Amino acid sequence: MQNNSYGYAVSVRVGGKEHRHWERYDIDSDFLIPADSFDFAIGRSGPEAAIPDLSGETCEVVIDGQTVMTGIIGSQRHGKSKGSRELSLSGRDLAGFLVDCSAPQLNVKGMTVLDAAKKLAAPWPQIKAVVLKAENNPALDKIDIEPGETVWQALTHIANSVGLHPWLEPDGTLVVGGADYSSPPVATLCWSRTDNRRNIERMDIEWDTDNRFSEVTFLAQSHGRSGDSAKHDLKWVYKDPTMTLHRPKTVVVSDADNLAALQKQAKKQLADWRLEGFTLTITVGGHKTRDGVLWQPGQRVHVIDDEHGIDAVFFLMGRRFMLSRMDGTQTELRLKEDGIWTPDAYPKKAEAARKRKGKRKGVSHKGKKGGKKQAETAVFE
C-alpha cells in the first residue's frame, strides 16, 4: 500500500488538454449514489493568465493515465484576494444528465431491459454505449413512468423491476446489471494492534436495524384487475426469524403483473434493506492496492479486524479518492456484505459468495440459535 504522498499524476482532461498540479481534490464513486462527483482546487500566489470558462464541458478525470470518471464540469469558481488566486472545478459523471432531466412518456412493455435503457439514454450523445451486465436480458411487464419522474428514476424503476440496477462506468458507458461476485479479492486489509500487516489508517463499523423488519407483506394488483383499484390480488410475505423485535411492514408494489414479478421486486427491496444493515468504512493511504491497482467500486476486498473478530471478503460499493495538505493522498472505501446486492444478476455467483465462509461478514443475527442459515438464504431463494 502506498504511503500518504503526492506521488500520483492526477489530471482533469478537457478538449485534449490536461489540467494538473491540484492542491486538493475529492473524487467520489458509489453504486448507490445516482451521480458520481468530483471537486478539484488549486491556489496561486499571484496573477496568472486568464483561464477560459470550462463549465458545461465534457471532461475526464485521470489518475496515472487511467480514466476514473467521465463527466461534465458543472461549476468553475475563481477566487481572488491580494497576493493570492484560487481556481476550483466541480462536476458529476454523465449520470448527472439523467438525474436532472425529466423522463419522456414511454411505453416499455415488451421491451427488454437493455432496449428500454438505450431508449431512455438516446437523447445524450455523450453516453456512447449502453450495455447489460447480467446473465439474462428480461422482457419488461407494464411499467408506468409517472409525469415528473427523472430519467434516472425511470431507469432505476425499470432495472429494479427485474432485480437489476443502473450505473455509469469510468469511461461513460451506461450499465444495467449487477455485481459479478466471482472475481478474486484485490487486497487484504488488516486492523490489528499486534500484527505488523496493519495497513488501515481508519476503520468505522456500523450496524443498523432501522430497515430490518420481523415481517414484510408485499402487495400488488395484477393488471388484469386494474378496474378495481381498491383490491390487491397479489401477495407475498417474508418473515425474518432473526429479528426479535415486533416490526411488521406492508409495501405496495405498483408494477407487478404476476406473483413472480412481485417476488423479484420484493427480493430486490429486501436485499437493499439488508445492505443498509452493515457498513464497513475504511480509509487507506494512497489510491492503489499493494499490487498497483486503482481502487474501484465492484472490487472485492478481504478484511481482517482482530478486535471485532472480522475475517471475511466484502464487496466494495463505493470509493472516494482524496488529497489534502494535512493528510496527503487517501482513499475511503465503503464496503458491504458480499453477495447481497443485485443477487438476480448472476444468481449462482451471488449464492456462492453468500455461502463462502467468514467471520462477522455482515448483519448481526438477532434471532434464536439455529435460525441463522434460514435467515441468510430465505430472501434470495
What are these regions (language model features)?
Residues M1-Q2, V68, R77, S81-G96, ...:
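Short beta-strand-centered interaction patches in the first periplasmic/extracellular domains
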Residues W124, A159-V162, P166, S222, ...:
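Sec/Tat-exported extracytoplasmic proteins
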Residues V14, I63-D64, R198:
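Structural motif
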Residues R20, R24-P52, R197-E381:
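An acidic/polar, Gly/Ser/Thr-rich interaction patch typically located in mid-to-C-terminal regions
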Residues M1-E18, E23:
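N-terminal alpha-helical "arm" segments
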Residues S45-V131:
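Surface-exposed cap/loop segments at beta↔alpha junctions
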Residues L114-K118, W152-T156, E215-V216, Q263, ...:
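Extracytoplasmic/secreted envelope proteins and their assembly/folding machinery
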Residues V62-G91, L168, V301-T331:
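Short beta-strand and beta-hairpin "edge-sheet" elements
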